[in-house]
Curated annotation (Swiss-Prot):
InterPro entries in alphabetical order: DeoD-type (IPR004402), Nucleoside_phosphorylase_CS (IPR018016), Nucleoside_phosphorylase_d (IPR000845), Nucleoside_phosphorylase_sf (IPR035994)
Name assigned to this protein: Purine nucleoside phosphorylase DeoD-type
UniProt source species: Escherichia coli O127:H6 (strain E2348/69 / EPEC)
HAMAP family found in the cross-reference section: Pur_nucleosid_phosp
Keyword line: Acetylation, Glycosyltransferase, Transferase
Length: 239
């Protein structure tokens, strides 16, 4: 039945949900990649759709910006609608010199300055990691599509406009591939409620060089990332 944030019924969502931050990107994915897509959520404008990809039922829904927002939606999808796998498909910023604009990054793990997972984990550090099989399937899907995806750590920041520029030096030292705002929270929710999760990002801007994609590009041109996510679902079904 419907929750405070999702006005759908059991069965409206597939067991796998792709989740961009922007609900308009969710609409774009549904209209571009899914067949027979229908809207299953519109509460607070957080659009959700269910359709099929190569005959496989798949859903896509926005999760908003930041760990608090994505935690609400992922928790409700898992506990109230039976979702088993969540794939975040979003954008990230780069700090490493060899990571370039529009590179695809598969988030094997996610560091964070948020305290949300410490609250969940009795004030201890929780290793926020993606599901191994989902990582492997995404890597295999990328190879099959001819996309040279990078695999490694993300950093999920609580602040988009960070006052601590020195932290980027630390991220570079530790080899952080991308800075975003949700992966660590999604991995924590998935672990807490027995689901599986993965984050795939496209580099939308470079923090060092100040190169960036436009808002329109972020909504419509990150197709390699979406194809990797969708094809990885099909590979997972073969296991």
């Amino acid at each position: 039945m419907a929750t405070p944030h999702i006005n759908a019924e059991m069965g409206d969502f597939a067991d796998v949900v792709l989740m961009p931050g922007d609900p308009l990107r969710a609409k774009y994915i549904a209209e571009t990649f899914l067949e027979d897509a229908r809207e299953v959520n519109n509460v607070r404008g957080m659009l959700g759709f269910t359709g099929t990809y190569k005959g496989r039922k798949i859903s896509v829904m926005g999760h908003g910006m930041g760990i608090p927002s994505c935690s609400i939606y992922t928790k409700e999808l898992i506990t109230d609608f039976g979702v088993k796998k969540i794939i975040r498909v979003g954008s990230c910023g780069a700090v490493l010199p060899h990571v370039k604009l529009r590179d695809v990054v598969i988030g094997m793990g996610a560091c964070t300055d948020s305290k949300v997972n410490r609250i969940r984990f009795k004030d201890h550090d929780f290793a926020a990691i993606a599901d191994f099989d989902m990582v492997r399937n995404a890597v295999d899907a990328a190879k099959a599509l001819g996309v040279d995806a990078r695999v490694g750590n993300l950093f999920s920041a609580d602040l988009f406009y960070s006052p601590d520029g020195e932290m980027f030096d630390v991220m570079e030292k530790y080899g952080i591939l991308g800075v975003e705002m949700e992966a660590a929270g999604i991995y924590g929710v998935a672990a807490e409620f027995g689901a599986k999760a993965l984050t795939i990002c496209t580099v939308s801007d470079h923090i060092r060089t100040h190169e960036q994609t436009t808002a329109a590009e972020r909504q419509t041109t990150f197709n390699d990332m979406i194809k990797i996510a969708l094809e990885s679902v099909l590979l997972g079904d073969k296991e």
